[in-house]
Amino acid sequence: MESAIGEHLQCPRTLTRRVPDTYTPPFPMWVGRADDALQQVVMGYLGVQFRDEDQRPAALQAMRDIVAGFDLPDGPAHHDLTHHIDNQGYENLIVVGYWKDVSSQHRWSTSTPIASWWESEDRLSDGLGFFREIVAPRAEQFETLYAFQEDLPGVGAVMDGISGEINEHGYWGSMRERFPISQTDWMQASGELRVIAGDPAVGGRVVVRGHDNIALIRSGQDWADAEADERSLYLDEILPTLQSGMDFLRDNGPAVGCYSNRFVRNIDIDGNFLDLSYNIGHWASLDQLERWSESHPTHLRIFTTFFRVAAGLSKLRLYHEVSVFDAADQLYEYINCHPGTGMLRDAVTIAEH
């Protein structure tokens, strides 16, 4: 049994765990492992937004243009494509890229082809919305959890390997305790989302500044290779409750501290749906994510179902990754997106102060 925290990230703990040292988890789970050369990763959520069906071809082409840019020097080591319909009826194509270090992502994003595409006046006049939500957690600021050991998705795809069975799972509070930084830091949030350029009500280009210790969760489901019984388990038992919980967070986020919640379906380069999905949730703080997870009926039902079936899972793949970030390691930019998009909804403007 291993700790979820890599040996090179372990230090004397000043904050106590929720369980005794003798705790044994009820079933096996694993985490991604990176060597000590990995200091910081970058997660880039690059979106194309449209509303009318006749805009779909242009939106898909814009998504392909973004993906093509990943082939340039210093592009991400891994990426995936997703689709989401928000509660305003807009469709969003989201390209998610992962880099193993900040410098390569900076070189890529500031290269002439990439920077000129995002900064072009065409982005303001082509009838589509675009957004960039880019965050860069340090190695001690993110954690992963997998119910499987091969072909890790998300940030796991840029890690160097997989752990053995880990101790910190199966109890409330284990998510926090998988963060290396949790050994000595409560990860308390401070500040607010603030619009620092543009006006969401007007449109055009808008930039939002984040604050310390915003939390981001990506919680995924992969039933592509599942047999009939596991497909039924996911589609008939897990998904309805999961959808209910995700819709609640999408529509009632401000009441519980959730800035943005998108339950997305993976797609291929032509926009066809794949049998994979995940949730993208931005939270004002990790403790607010914890409070919702531990108290909301929909998540409790999901958690109970997972506990019941986890030990017997074969080809239904469930996982999550959770990160927190310093304010300086976040960029939220929106171009002609509706004002309820992403971090725009809860960001305050100068006029509101």
From Swiss-Prot:
It is an enzyme of class 4 (lyase). Keywords: Heme, Iron, Lyase, Metal-binding. Its cofactor is heme b. Optimum pH is 8.0. The substrate is directly bound to the heme iron. Changing S219A: Retains 23% of wild-type activity with Z-phenylacetaldoxime as substrate. An aliphatic aldoxime binds at S219, H320. Optimum temperature is 30 degrees Celsius. InterPro entries: OXD (IPR025702). One of its GO terms (molecular function) is lyase activity. Active when the heme iron is in the ferrous state. The activity is enhanced by reducing agents, such as Na(2)S, Na(2)S(2)(O4), 2-mercaptoethanol, and L-cysteine and supplementary additions of electron acceptors such as flavins, sulfite ion, and vitamin K3. The effect of various chemicals on the enzyme activity is different in the presence and absence of the reducing reagent, Na(2)S, which acts not only as a reductant but also changes the substrate specificity of the enzyme. Pfam families: Dehydratase_hem. This is Aliphatic aldoxime dehydratase. The gene is oxd.
